[in-house]
Amino acid sequence: MALGLEDKKAIVAEVNEAAKGALSAVVADSRGVTVGDMTGLRKAAREAGVYVKVVRNTLVKRAVAGTDFECLADTFTGPTLIAFSNEHPGAAARLLKDFAKEQEKFEIKAAAFEGELIPADNIDRLAKLPTYEEALAQFMMTLKEASAGKLVRTLAALRDQKEAA
């Protein structure tokens, strides 16, 4: 079904708005994925704070022009599904990577983060970024280990000092 000019402008504006507020983007090819599976992906995306849309290549190229995701323009070939992470940079990459494991026909093309193009084979770089809570927990564990190590060294020094006296 052909889209009218106003419909095309609305789609470009919607995707552009999503791109402006996004932290990262992932582009994929969803050929061969059933409607039911795509519905499940969209539901999971909403829960994860990820904007997912299947858009015509010419429209998505116009929508990302002038944003950090302009570097993805060469990946817009064939059927294009684009996902923008709004809350956490790795959310879209993690979501689509997990979906690709379940769906053998689903193929991730590339991702972008802070204006840098990330090829599909390096998508783990983005998907493995810790969330704020995970990073905070890792930091606290490091502090806890450091203070415990300091206590052990202090007690050992105290013991050595008493043995020497």
Swiss-Prot record:
Q: Is Ribosomal protein included in the keywords of this UniProt record?
A: yes
Q: Which Gene3D superfamilies does the entry mention?
A: 3.30.70.1730, 6.10.250.2350
The protein's matches in InterPro entries, at most eight in alphabetical order, are given as: Ribosomal_uL10, Ribosomal_uL10-like_sf, Ribosomal_uL10_bac, Ribosomal_uL10_bac_type, Ribosomal_uL10_CS_bac
GO MF, one annotated term: large ribosomal subunit rRNA binding
Which key words are in the record?
Answer: Ribonucleoprotein, Ribosomal protein, RNA-binding, rRNA-binding
| PANTHER family in the record | 39S RIBOSOMAL PROTEIN L10, MITOCHONDRIAL
Q: Which HAMAP family match?
A: Ribosomal_uL10
The text of the family note is: Belongs to the universal ribosomal protein uL10 family.
The subunit field of the Swiss-Prot or TrEMBL record says:
Part of the ribosomal stalk of the 50S ribosomal subunit. The N-terminus interacts with L11 and the large rRNA to form the base of the stalk. The C-terminus forms an elongated spine to which L12 dimers bind in a sequential fashion forming a multimeric L10(L12)X complex.
Name the chain's protein: Large ribosomal subunit protein uL10
* Taxonomic source organism: Shewanella piezotolerans (strain WP3 / JCM 13877)
Taxonomy-wise, where does this protein's organism fall, top ranks first? Bacteria, Pseudomonadati, Pseudomonadota, Gammaproteobacteria, Alteromonadales
Q: Which gene encodes it?
A: rplJ
